[in-house]
């Protein structure tokens, strides 16, 4: 038998057969908090004798742990992913794997392939870093979205995309990285080489969404003004002349919802994810 523990994940191999792979290690004493980062190894025997032999251990390098800066801590930010524990997340925890202090995405497109915060957020500032490890990566950040739906329409999707890749040469402007998908196009940003970490901030205050990448504001717009208040077609049809993608976005004006990592394929990793909740802004109607 072999037991491997990395961050908050455990893999068990019994007689050459993997019986558990990258399963979240829960805190048996209190499931509301993550498992401890370190501790003793305990052998537990039930009602039958337990015989163990040839037991040995190899310690692995510690996973980097992210902590808030003094400024962010004083400003009210909260860590959503510290590099080791995903206890603040739910959904597809199988294809979003902690690797060397990052969340590595292996999920494919679809509601069941998404990872969500357990908590819902309304107005907030979300900060994180991301890196593409291959060309043509497509992903997204869902905001104010329910779980298990297409966030681009039933909430909002802030596009995450390697739009410089040749396969996206015919990309529509509202699909560029940082866009509020189908609603407000973002300014096109030039990414550094693959593997380089990018810094992003998403600010959602009422109807105003602001996206900053590597210190540059690439989107600052009002979602209600962008569609003239018509997030769905006035005639009840499927074609909406007021949105740039001409589709209905019934969840566009959600007051709150989950934040989601929207897997459209492998090849992206996230780290240093933190958030600051803001007082609810007054929305013009």
Task: Enumerate the language-model features and the residues they cover.
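Carbohydrate-interacting regions of secretory-pathway proteins
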Residues: 2-285
